[in-house]
């Protein structure tokens, strides 16, 4: 048990009485597989059918068998980024745990529902959000609305890892509609409000993109935290390490700070 909303409201009021701000964790790249949206999405005829990234098995393969995944993307947590669902007869994308299916932000109804939820919390009096992996919400699609690797001629996309899967981050991080989605979120949720703060967890974002996204003129996010420095002792994966050099750490942190010095 995590308490009641009455407990939360009492905590929020007490925090504000002591001039403390309450910033909520916000996870909208994905939901739980137990969420009502996802459970409804398992039915192809439900209005929520396109709220997640559902794809059929690769042509010529038996659904649910090894190698039948729509493409060879790997999950951040290991294994395939695709999980077969027997009820729907298709696979859903999960960049993280199979318990965390990715929302389809290309669907305007998804965005509308997310913004509605965010407004509910803001109206309750919270002071902003820490946005989990928010830079992964826009995926790169081809001209036919397909994700990379969905056709046989693209089986070799990306460098293969030890498990036989490719890194999905080049296709899911800082996608082509990220700025559009963040600016829309700003308009729909935060426009006209004062005294709030937003910070985004930003895998795959360069210092230059950090400067753009946090520029007040672009009306996206207030702050980001990056990960360039996390991998300076890694080569390809966190399990493949290289000697740590403090100069590399200084250079990485300096580049991040220099980009937003103004």
Task: Name what the model sees in each region.
Residues 194, 202-262:
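Noncatalytic carbohydrate-binding groove/subsite architecture in carbohydrate-active enzymes
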Residues 135-136, 252:
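Conserved nucleotide-binding/hydrolysis micro-motifs of P-loop NTPases
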Residues 129-131:
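Hydrophobic residues within beta-strands of alpha/beta enzymes
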Residues 1-119, 123, 136-206:
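Acidic/aromatic-lined carbohydrate-recognition and catalytic surfaces
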């Amino acid at each position: 048990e995590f308490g009641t909303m009455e407990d939360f409201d009492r905590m929020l009021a007490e925090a504000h009485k002591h001039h403390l701000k309450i910033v909520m964790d916000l996870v909208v790249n994905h939901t739980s597989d137990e969420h009502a949206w996802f459970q409804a999405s398992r039915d192809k005829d439900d209005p929520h059918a396109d709220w997640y990234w559902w794809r059929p098995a690769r042509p010529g393969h038996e659904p649910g068998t090894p190698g039948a995944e729509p493409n060879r993307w790997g999950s951040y947590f290991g294994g395939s980024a695709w999980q077969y669902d027997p009820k729907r007869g298709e696979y859903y994308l999960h960049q993280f745990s199979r318990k965390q299916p990715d929302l389809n932000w290309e669907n305007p109804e998804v965005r509308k529902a997310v913004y509605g939820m965010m407004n509910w919390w803001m109206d309750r009096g919270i002071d902003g959000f820490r946005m989990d992996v928010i830079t992964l919400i826009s995926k790169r699609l081809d001209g036919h609305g397909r994700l990379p690797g969905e056709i046989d001629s693209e089986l070799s996309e990306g460098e293969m890892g030890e498990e036989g899967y490719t890194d999905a981050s080049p296709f899911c991080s800082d996608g082509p509609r990220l700025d559009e989605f963040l600016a829309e979120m700003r308009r729909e949720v935060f426009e006209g409000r004062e005294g709030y703060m937003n910070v985004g967890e930003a895998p795959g974002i360069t210092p230059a993109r950090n400067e753009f996204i946090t520029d007040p003129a672009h009306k996206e996010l207030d702050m980001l935290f990056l990960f360039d420095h996390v991998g300076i002792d890694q080569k390809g994966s966190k399990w493949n390490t290289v000697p740590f050099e403090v100069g590399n750490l200084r250079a990485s942190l300096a580049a991040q700070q220099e980009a937003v010095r103004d």
